C-alpha cells in the first residue's frame, strides 16, 4: 500500500520535476564551462553530439539532468565532491542517479572501479571525471554559487 501511495502522489508531477532537473543541469553545465571546466553535457553546443541530440530529443525535457566534468585528477575530483558535500551542502556522494538532491560520483573509483586503466581510458573515464545528477531542490542561483565555490576549492 505504501508504494502504491508513493507512485500515485508523485507520478503526476514527474514531468515537471524532470523539466526542472534538466533546466538546472544545463545551468550547472554552462556555469562550469564558463569557469573553464571540461564539461560533458549534450545540451551544450560544445558537445560533439549536440546536433544529433537536438534532432532526436524531446525539446520539453532538455538534455536531461546528468552531466560530467573532468577535473584532471582523482585528487581534484575528490576535493570537488568533498567540498560540495561537506562545506556547501550541495549534494551527496553516491553512485545512484535518481533523487531530488544532487548526487555525485567519481566513476573511475566507483561505478567503473573494476576496469583497468586502459579500459577506463577506452571508455572515456579519466581519474578526474565526476558525474553529477543535478537535483531540483534549493534556489538555482544559490546552487550555482555553491558549484562555483566547489570548483574553485578543487582547482584554485
Where are the model-predicted features located?
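Short amphipathic alpha-helical segments with coiled-coil-like heptad repeat character
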Residues: 27-33, 88-89, 140-145
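A common structural junction motif
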Residues: 84-98, 149-156
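FAD-binding core of FAD-dependent oxidoreductases
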Residues: 3, 93-108
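A generic structural signal for well-ordered coil/turn residues at beta-strand boundaries
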Residues: 63-65, 98-100, 126-128
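Short Gly/Pro-enriched turn/cap motifs at secondary-structure boundaries
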Residues: 57-59, 89, 93, 121
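Structural motif of enzymes handling amino- and sulfur-group chemistry
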Residues: 1-78
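PLP-dependent enzyme catalytic core of the Aspartate aminotransferase-like
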Residues: 74-75, 102-156
Amino acid at each position: 500500500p505504501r508504494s502504491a501511495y508513493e507512485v500515485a502522489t508523485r507520478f503526476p508531477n514527474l514531468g515537471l520535476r524532470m523539466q526542472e532537473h534538466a533546466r538546472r543541469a544545463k545551468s550547472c553545465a554552462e556555469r562550469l564551462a564558463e569557469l573553464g571546466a571540461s564539461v560533458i553535457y549534450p545540451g551544450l553546443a560544445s558537445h560533439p553530439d549536440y546536433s544529433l541530440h537536438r534532432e532526436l530529443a524531446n525539446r520539453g525535457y532538455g538534455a536531461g539532468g546528468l552531466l560530467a566534468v573532468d577535473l584532471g585528477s582523482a585528487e581534484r575530483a575528490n576535493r570537488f565532491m568533498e567540498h560540495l558535500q561537506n562545506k556547501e551542502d550541495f549534494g551527496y556522494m553516491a553512485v545512484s542517479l535518481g533523487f531530488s538532491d544532487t548526487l555525485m560520483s567519481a566513476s573511475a573509483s566507483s561505478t567503473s572501479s573494476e576496469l583497468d586503466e586502459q579500459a577506463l581510458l577506452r571508455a572515456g573515464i579519466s581519474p578526474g571525471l565526476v558525474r553529477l545528477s543535478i537535483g531540483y531542490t534549493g534556489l538555482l542561483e544559490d546552487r550555482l554559487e555553491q558549484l562555483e565555490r566547489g570548483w574553485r576549492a578543487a582547482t584554485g
